[in-house]
Amino acid sequence: NKNGYIVAERGDINRVDKTFSISKTYLSNVVGLAHDKGYIRDVHESVGSYMSTDHFVSDHNSKITWDHLLRQTSHWQGTLWDKPDWADRPPKDIPWTELQTQPLYEPGTFWKYNDVRVNLLALSALHVWRRPLPQILKKYIMPIREMMLKRLILTIH
């Protein structure tokens, strides 16, 4: 609304919408903040050096960096919380029985969206912060978002 006129509309403003991709936005903020604070020294460093689990010990997974996880180019291989990476968004043209034997791409060379790998990024960030990520969001990210929203509202009026 500007000077009493509606300048744009999109969708039903009273309807609740699902926000599927918000986790990637928050995770990139949390990881970026960890880097800014020195908790992550270099985004091109192996994530495995920050973990006390075996998620990054294989020859392939040990090459995966924060940058690879953030860009979804890690091609991490494994199982997280009973869900194997290959079971998430499998290609339609490959039989289910052959999914486990697909070739691995070198980290950083192949992009593929994968919920298991997004969850792995969240687990990795949790290992860095050593406290629940919602606490990090509440303390560091949300106050900035609220300030920006207030500034935007003041600018519009």
Residue spans for each PLM region:
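Short, conserved catalytic-motif segment at the N-terminal edge
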Residues: 1-19
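A glycine-rich, coil/turn loop motif that links secondary-structure elements
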Residues: 16-21, 56-63, 109-115, 157
